[in-house]
UniProtKB/Swiss-Prot annotation:
GO MF entry, a single one: glutamate-5-semialdehyde dehydrogenase activity
Function: Catalyzes the NADPH-dependent reduction of L-glutamate 5-phosphate into L-glutamate 5-semialdehyde and phosphate. The product spontaneously undergoes cyclization to form 1-pyrroline-5-carboxylate.
Record-level GO BP terms: L-proline biosynthetic process
Enzyme class: oxidoreductase
Keyword Oxidoreductase in record: yes
Species name: Salmonella schwarzengrund (strain CVM19633)
GO cellular component, one term: cytoplasm
Catalytic activity entry: L-glutamate 5-semialdehyde + phosphate + NADP(+) = L-glutamyl 5-phosphate + NADPH + H(+)
Primary gene name: proA
PROSITE patterns registered for this protein in UniProt: PROA
Protein family per UniProt: Belongs to the gamma-glutamyl phosphate reductase family.
Name under which the protein is recorded: Gamma-glutamyl phosphate reductase
Amino acid sequence: MLEQMGIAAKAASYKLALLSSCEKNRVLEKIADELEAQMESILSANVQDVEQARANGLSEAMLDRLALTPARLKAIADDVRQVCNLADPVGQVIDGGLLDSGLRLERRRVPLGVVGVIYEARPNVTVDVASLCLKTGNAVILRGGKETHRTNAATVRVIQKALKACGLPEAAVQAIDNPDRSLVNEMLRMDKYIDMLIPRGGAGLHKLCREQSTIPVITGGIGVCHIFVDSSADIAPALKIIVNAKTQRPSTCNTVETLLVHQDIAERFLPVLSKQMAESGVTLHGDETVMQALHGPAKLVPLKPEELDNEFLSLDLNVVVVENMDGAIAHIREHGTQHSDAILTSDMHNAARFVNEVDSAAVYVNASTRFTDGGQFGLGAEVAVSTQKLHARGPMGLEALTTYKWIGFGDGTIRA
């Protein structure tokens, strides 16, 4: 089954690579319209998925990731329309020039070909990935989690209907709807057909893909994100940033999980933090210093060492007091996932040092980690957030779904 999907996807990719920007935008507009027109069928499938997931004991954080609402689906359709408005990178000449040999050389951006994506309980990924791949002339094979198989199937049917209406092969966007896990291992070895693989899920999925895939893999999306409250931080805006980074949508990978507090500000900062977190419903997981300093009003529990390496994806926040900037940077290097980290400070020398020494895909000064997102970065919907350094890093927009080819123009030109 998968080989036939691969053959069809590869054939579709050749056709997609030749489309003009106008032709690609036309199909994206059609997809957005169909998502809204077929909203009832998609939401009905999603309700079944959510009910099944709840019966299977999925956490509230996972249920939030899984659930679609009319507003969320409308936002997804609007994201597709925003992709239409983005500049098409395909065909762009990156650089080049006339060589001494007389050969005119240029480096031109081209589609990757076929992209494979394996993801878990995130139904929005189906549309986000499909829209970005189509905009860049790539075919895509999707393998969503069993928790979302009804939603994904309904969504892909809508996308394929739009493709067909625009005279494009339905195989440009395909989904593996069989929940058999052995198919994941089979997909990981489809290097004959798939040019790049992107896993979006937990650490176990990323480890499996890194170890078993014969396809180049882009990993990321696991966000043990930190905020360091420096000794010179302005407390009022710092609290506002922390509340946003923790509570706006706790189930996302760019949510802060560990707060590092400089010891020189801890005595003044921790009590007001506790009050603010109590109002926001956040449970604090405190180290020994925090446990001794606070006795309410926020719910406070002792921090377990292993929690420093985990994504809570919930209204829980580690709070650790550090001696200085060195301690904060060392902690992030040991426990971070190179996703998103921030410093809150009034000292621009310290800000510059933090930016230079923290090796993460996104580093912020006096801003929330929640900005690490393709839409927020002006990239449109993202295919993933890469925490590695090759071939892409951070939110992966359109350019991350392209490669380049060298093109030489001559006039009977030969090498001397």
